[in-house]
């Protein structure tokens, strides 16, 4: 940024994920009191250096393993400096409403403003939850809580394609999982989870379990690079591959995916809100 410059102003949050990884690594556990103090000190240093708040991305490992108390503690540090809590919530589909409630409660506990990134209801089964999610935010604002949100102006969301895999496979980190993905048994296990299990942010199911509705924005893989912008189903067809084999190769390459999970009506409804 300093070398190239930008035509707009830029501000920076300090990521909860980065802080957690520095202190705990990628493990699935709670920090000890001493470790939590170390995490708070890192947040404090970032705020003193000019950060505008603490941000979280709670669908991705290792942040997905964090409990609300841990996040509130870091957001509270941001509040001490007049900063806010900015969150990519824990769930945007089956447990959307619980995730909104969690974000609002973290803000109350930390005594800091809340900003929700990419407010959405992902998956057709969850589209009806958007009015209630908006109502929760409006009620919080009416009570005096400072809450805002931003919204995608389109119906595809964006994420690293590895996020389609259950978070439990990432406890040793992304690189460790990639090294194991050549194992057909592991691939079959992951496929079965994606096709049949709930209780987690299952983006494959949010996209209707349809590879035609998952566009690859950037493959980061020399074999597939010329098909950036096409659906995974189309890329697999062009290569004469089973879509699941293409999927796992794209995970190994670190592809960025654009699943079609949202409704046009919800998009318009969200954009019309005053927050």
Regions found by a protein language model. Give the residues of each.
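N-terminal, positively charged nucleic-acid-binding surface of large information/translation enzymes
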Residues: 1-5
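Divalent metal-binding pocket/active-site signature
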Residues: 45, 51-103
